Design a protein with these regions (language model features):
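Short glycine-rich phosphate-binding loop at a beta-alpha junction
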Residues: 82-91, 97, 251, 386, ...
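Flexible helix-coil linker/hinge segments at domain or subdomain boundaries
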Residues: 600-616
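Metal-dependent catalytic core segments for phosphate chemistry
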Residues: 17-38, 42-54, 384, 391-425, ...
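Short hydrophobic beta-strand that contains or immediately precedes a catalytic carboxylate
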Residues: 5-7, 111-112, 382-386, 617
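Active-site-proximal helix-loop-helix substrate-binding element of RNase H-like nuclease domains
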Residues: 32, 40-187, 415-434
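Conserved "right-hand" nucleotidyltransferase catalytic core of DNA-directed polymerases
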Residues: 1-36, 40-48, 127-131, 142, ...
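Conserved catalytic core of nucleic-acid polymerases
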Residues: 212, 269, 325-330, 334-337, ...
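Short amphipathic alpha-helices in soluble, non-transmembrane regions
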Residues: 590-598
């Protein structure tokens, strides 16, 4: 792999505009310079004091105020010479090029992200992560400490000739360090993890384009939802006042005052503490308390109503007003969690200088009235492709449990199976009754779904009761929770063996790897007492949850070469689903064809493994996220 490092410096006419590539389209932002760097065995060095520690040298250079043609020339040269373009947070750089009108040239090239390579090598759960920042300056300080601080003295605003040249030199140094670090990281990756890296990197142009394009949102629907939610907030607060007349909105919005109310005045038992040792009142704590105390349930209802109003109505309207083009732009982040999942950030900056560029897309509620405000662009339809039973199927593969594997075959229903086992009734009869709309059968299947989705990660009996009450509206007695917990272990006997195997591997090697090659670093035994449970849980959860992320990246890599046949585009991704937009005239065919493609991904070619089961994809289409209909 021949690398060419690439880095842009940008500016804009408004605060934060220099970090918003879509502003190029309106002329409100621009690239002030870009720099490139390559290893050069001939020893030619454009920047004399930026040299590589190996025998090779670096040929580097930069261009001030590049034109579209200048950027096109660079991209065309890389394509013709079969170079892989590497950046640091490469999606950002690629997005600026796409905004300049160079979509075709960006897609024609291979891309890599040095920052993500570093994450692959050092990936760890939050509890044991040593690296707190994956910025380029942090990497230079860690691997080339003698050269740290090279950014000192750079003025990013001054326009005198000396300052401009100093910024250009800094830009070139960024490119050189990106090249050196990427080369170092690649040399430390074995073949299987490298496969995961390259598949992930194949998605960079698609994610960059989605960053520029944004997501259409209906301000009218967001405002209508807001009116409904304000009434919900009003009613919820009336309930709060009936419960305790001394409670005010200020108390409910202050963690300190809320803690004093719950654990002081009301005498409830704290569930956990914050980093400072104070009793926590986060969502998990309130969910737990609400499951057992009606007063806490009312407080939770109020806080959720207030949060829903702000997050799903007010913030949408604020983002639409800020962007000014009918779109919200939550910023997608590849490999954002330790499991590899993509997430979205909704804002830039903090406090009074906060820029509401997007919405909290990865936290969006399921209700149709919430989702209907997310629409396809005019003339397009929204297509959703969702991996059916994704985590259940991967647990079946990892645990090799024969019952689980059988339940992944066509015509089977794992939730009805578990529901029948819990209720001690006939599985096939329950399936039939569910299909006929029998409410009793549906309730039994719901218990089966609770068991299947909650217990495969070693959930305790007590936690199962909380999940049942909060997420499913099912109050369970201790005896019922115990029976579901035991039934799960009886039906899927290989799953507890998988748990033990993963804990053993983690303690022996300190590393867990999924089937696609993605790794997480834990620590070799002996483990401190306070980390034993979270580390063993990571060893169990990671192969299942992370392979779901890699399955998504593989799907996107396949779609990169497929969508153009339908004039379709990647829109966003969420949980188990991928969202595509296609012209209305081609949407039906695209939905059917892409469903077939995604249901038969090239796992053997990509990961070198033969899977014992299929991973079918469900498809939906419609004008908005809240109006999607199934595609058969």
């Amino acid at each position: 792999m021949e690398l060419t490092a690439f880095d842009v410096e940008t500016t804009g006419d408004g605060e934060w505009y220099g970090l918003q590539p879509w502003r190029v389209i309106t002329g409100d932002a621009r690239i002030t310079s870009f720099a490139t760097a390559e290893f050069d065995a001939s020893g030619s060095v454009v920047v004399p004091d930026v040299a590589c520690e190996s025998k090779a040298r670096i040929r580097a250079g930069g261009l001030l105020n590049p034109t579209t043609e200048g950027a096109r020339k660079f991209l065309t040269s890389c394509h013709e010479r079969k170079r892989t373009i590497v950046g640091w947070n490469t999606t950002f750089d690629a997005a600026w090029l796409i905004a300049m009108g160079l979509r075709e040239e960006v897609y024609a090239n291979h891309w890599l992200d040095g920052m993500l390579l570093w994450k692959h090598l050092t990936n760890a759960p939050e509890s044991t992560r040593l690296i707190k920042s994956y910025g380029l300056k942090s990497a230079v300080a860690r691997y080339y400490p003698q050269e740290a601080g090279y950014e000192a003295g750079v003025d990013f605003d001054a326009m005198d000739r000396a300052s401009v040249q100093k910024r250009l030199r800094y830009n070139i140094q960024d490119a050189c360090f990106t090249l050196r670090l990427t080369d170092l990281f690649l040399s430390n990756l074995s073949e299987l993890p490298r496969r995961a890296v390259l598949l992930e990197a194949a998605c960079i142009p698609m994610v960059a384009e989605a960053t520029v394009s944004g997501i259409c949102a209906s301000g009218e629907r967001a405002a209508a939802l807001g009116e409904k939610l304000r009434e919900v907030v009003r009613i919820a607060f009336v309930k709060v006042k009936i419960t305790d007349g001394s409670v005010t909105p200020e108390i409910l919005s202050s963690p300190k005052q809320l803690s004093e109310l719950l654990f002081g005045k009301w005498g409830l038992t704290p569930i956990k503490t914050t980093a400072t040792g104070a009793p926590s009142v986060d969502k998990e704590v309130l969910d737990t308390l609400a499951a057992f105390d009606p007063r806490a349930a009312i407080l939770r209802e109020y806080r959720e109503a207030v949060n829903n109003l702000k997050k799903f109505s007010d913030n949408t309207l604020a983002s639409l007003a800020y962007n000014g083009d009918g779109r919200v732009r939550p910023a997608p982040r590849i490999f954002s969690t330790y499991t590899g999942r993509m997430t979205y950030s909704s804002k830039m900056g903090t406090g009074s200088k906060e820029a509401p560029v997007g919405i909290a897309l990865h936290q969006w509620k399921r209700g149709a009235e919430y989702r209907a405000q997310i629409t396809a662009p005019r003339g397009y339809e929204l297509l959703e492709f969702d991996f059916s039973g994704q985590e259940f199927r991967w647990m079946a593969v990892e645990s090799r449990d024969q019952t689980m594997l059988k339940l992944c075959e066509p015509g089977e229903d794992a939730h009805s199976y578990m529901g029948a086992a819990i209720a001690q009734c006939n599985y096939r009869h329950l399936m039939q009754a569910v299909a006929e709309g029998d409410p009793v059968a549906d309730g039994r299947r719901k218990l089966g779904k609770l068991g299947n989705l909650s217990l495969q990660y070693r959930t305790s009996r007590q936690r199962l009761q909380i999940v049942a009450k909060v997420q499913y509206g099912l109050p369970l007695t201790d005896e019922e929770s115990e029976e579901i917990w035991r039934t799960y272990r009886r039906q899927y006997q290989n799953v507890p063996l998988y748990w033990k195997r993963q804990e053993y591997l983690a303690k022996r090697t300190g590393v867990i790897q999924n089937l696609a090659g993605r790794m997480v670093n834990l620590m070799q035994a002996p483990w401190p007492d306070h980390l034993t449970w979270p580390l063993s849980s990571t060893a169990i959860n990671f192969p299942i949850q992370s392979i779901g992320a890699d399955q998504k990246y593989l799907a996107l890599a396949v779609l990169r070469n497929t969508l153009s046949a339908y004039d379709a585009y990647f829109y966003f991704e969420l949980h188990d689903g991928l969202f595509i937009i296609a012209p209305r005239a081609k949407a039906e065919k695209a939905a059917h064809d892409l469903k077939a493609v995604l249901s038969d991904l090239p796992y053997k070619k990509a990961w070198g493994i033969d899977l014992p089961i299929k991973f079918p994809v469900d498809a939906k289409r419609g004008p908005s996220w809240g109006e999607l209909k199934g595609v058969k």
